[in-house]
Amino acid sequence: SARGYAWCGALTALLTGQSYVTSAEMAKQHGAFPGYYRNRDHMLRVIRNHRRAAWNAEKSEYEGLTVKPTGINAAYLPDDLVQRARKVWDKALELGEVHGFRNAQVSVIAPTGTIGLLMDCDTTGIEPDFALVKFKKLAGGGYFKIINNSVPPALSRLGYSESEVREIITHATGHRTLKGAPYINH
């Protein structure tokens, strides 16, 4: 129903908008996510477009979109809910322009498998990664194995040398476990 869409849109706007506010606050303290500055203009365009959807902007106001997103339909919602959703996106944009964001993505609606891979992320939201090594199905058939991107820097931080990290990663990718990996204290 139109009312159901409006409520889902407003609640999702609040959830995602507040998550980006928090992400910007985290970036102020700990720095933006790796690759943020390389993608800053695109990231801020996405945030501006989300903000416009919260304000139910006209199609001509969106940047780089050919299809107008469904904005929040205030006719079916309590005014305070609409205002909170709009204010949180105003704040997300304001803080993001100054500090960047700690997270590239903060929420997603499935399917997620390839989306995260294309965005250079292990996960596309707040959920933890489900495996140390994952299989990615290829469109043309077959699979390839990928290791969680946080593993190499974690091993380096633990004091392993570059060559040790490479050997550990090779073992983990091949065996899908750290068990039996060289240099690991089992």
Map each language-model feature to its residues.
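Long, C-terminal-biased catalytic regions of enzyme "large/alpha" subunits
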Residues: S1-H186
